């Protein structure tokens, strides 16, 4: 196995000493990069890009050629699981992901097949192993999945939603049906993430993108409990190293205390939760990741530097010298000038030295 040349990302997640703050960016391989757009045009469409091992590897590596990032993340989509369960994923221009089938009844849930990730999502595993090999130990590779709650919203609604009408209707009128769906999805995610780890993923992130749409009790019952189940079912060591797990609930800053109980090594934050507040809440029990507003990257070099320095000041305000990974508070947007993320990345590495040196 190739020796990892830069492991500060993994070390920070495990609250071990680091020489500088590690950084990666959610959606770092994406439409803001001209080379990504060129590769996507060769693939023909987004799904073809995900399913072609060579293209998926290429776009995963593209941001690492531009920026001094401390981790790569698998290029894929959170909706690969529902697609493999037979719902028929497709994308409509300007409308995002959609499914040919929905899951809205007890019978719909009963009809879902058991996922065999290594067979049903072999293109993802091929991409993971190919990317891991291509990285050559440069930086660790992050694998990922959507949370059961987040996946369920797409499956019940039939695509993206702002109100989650049908999912919340199921939650309050037929909670047993939703629980059955979430349990099926939790088992699927466990299988999927363990297959990614076997293929070479060195850390895992669970994207609970829509957890913040829930009230507190419902968040615990319908989202958090199933992430607990997933983390308990994951391989936590491979090739003699721990596999760190990050849980990211967008809009979940008020739930840090219960989120610690998941067994995750780190919690992701969006930009609505001050890092110094979050540090005080978690009190060194888990690492934190985040949380620059992606819109900051629309600004000038000076304004980006100012915002990044303020974020780092907050992250290290309580005197802790590790347990922190810099990131955006959500995915980078397609309208960002590719020159701006370099300012973000370089400022993190340079400025954090005053705290970690």
UniProtKB/Swiss-Prot annotation:
Coiled-coil stretches: none
Subcellular location: Cytoplasm
InterPro entries, alphabetized: UROD/MetE-like_sf, Uroporphyrinogen_deCO2ase_HemE, Uroporphyrinogen_deCOase
Catalysed reactions listed for this entry: uroporphyrinogen III + 4 H(+) = coproporphyrinogen III + 4 CO2
Keywords from the named record: Cytoplasm, Decarboxylase, Lyase, Porphyrin biosynthesis
E.C. no: 4.1.1.37
GO cellular component: cytosol
Superkingdom classification of source: Bacteria
A Gene Ontology BP annotation from the UniProt entry: protoporphyrinogen IX biosynthetic process from glutamate
Signal sequence bounds: none
S-S bridge residues: none
This protein's pathway: Porphyrin-containing compound metabolism; protoporphyrin-IX biosynthesis; coproporphyrinogen-III from 5-aminolevulinate: step 4/4
Residues annotated as binding substrate: 27-31, 77, 154, 209, 330
PROSITE patterns, per the entry: UROD_1 (PS00906), UROD_2 (PS00907)
Site-annotated residues for Transition state stabilizer: 77
PANTHER family hit by this protein: METHYLTETRAHYDROFOLATE:HOMOCYSTEINE METHYLTRANSFERASE RELATED, UROPORPHYRINOGEN DECARBOXYLASE
NCBIfam families assigned to the protein according to its UniProt record, in alphabetical order: hemE (TIGR01464)
Function: Catalyzes the decarboxylation of four acetate groups of uroporphyrinogen-III to yield coproporphyrinogen-III.
Assembly, per entry: Homodimer.
Protein family (similarity comment): Belongs to the uroporphyrinogen decarboxylase family.
Protein name, as recorded: Uroporphyrinogen decarboxylase
Gene: hemE
């Amino acid at each position: 196995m190739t020796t990892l040349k830069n492991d500060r990302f993994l070390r920070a997640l495990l609250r071990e000493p680091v020489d500088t703050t590690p950084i990666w960016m959610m959606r770092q391989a994406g439409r803001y990069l001209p080379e990504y757009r060129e590769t996507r045009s060769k693939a023909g469409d987004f799904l073809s890009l995900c399913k072609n091992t060579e293209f998926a590897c290429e776009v995963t590596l593209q941001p690492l050629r531009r920026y001094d990032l401390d981790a790569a993340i698998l290029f894929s989509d959170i909706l690969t699981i529902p697609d493999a369960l037979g719902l028929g994923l497709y994308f409509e221009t300007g409308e995002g992901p959609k499914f040919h089938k929905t899951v809205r009844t007890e019978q719909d849930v009963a009809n879902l097949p058991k996922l065999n990730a290594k067979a049903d999502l072999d293109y993802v595993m091929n991409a993971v192993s190919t990317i891991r090999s291509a990285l050559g130990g440069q930086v660790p590779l992050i694998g990922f999945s959507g949370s059961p709650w987040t996946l369920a919203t797409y499956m019940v609604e039939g695509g993206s939603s702002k109100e989650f009408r049908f999912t919340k209707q199921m939650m309050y009128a037929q909670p047993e049906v939703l629980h059955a769906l979430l349990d099926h999805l939790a088992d699927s995610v466990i299988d999927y993430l363990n297959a990614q780890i076997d293929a070479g993923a060195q850390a895992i992130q669970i994207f609970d993108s829509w957890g913040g749409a829930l009230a507190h009790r419902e968040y615990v019952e319908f989202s958090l409990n199933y992430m607990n189940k997933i983390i308990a079912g994951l391989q936590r060591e491979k090739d003699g190293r721990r596999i760190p797990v990050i849980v990211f609930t967008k809009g979940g800053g008020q739930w840090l205390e219960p989120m610690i109980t998941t067994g995750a090594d780190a919690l992701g934050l969006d930009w609505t939760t001050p890092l110094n507040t979050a540090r005080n809440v978690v009190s060194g029990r888990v690492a934190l990741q985040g949380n620059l507003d992606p819109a900051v990257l629309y600004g000038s070099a000076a304004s980006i530097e100012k915002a990044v320095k303020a974020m780092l000041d907050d992250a290290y305000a309580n005197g802790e010298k590790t347990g922190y990974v810099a990131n955006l508070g959500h995915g980078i947007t397609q309208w960002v000038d590719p020159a701006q993320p370099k300012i973000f990345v370089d400022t993190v590495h340079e400025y954090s030295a005053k705290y970690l040196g």
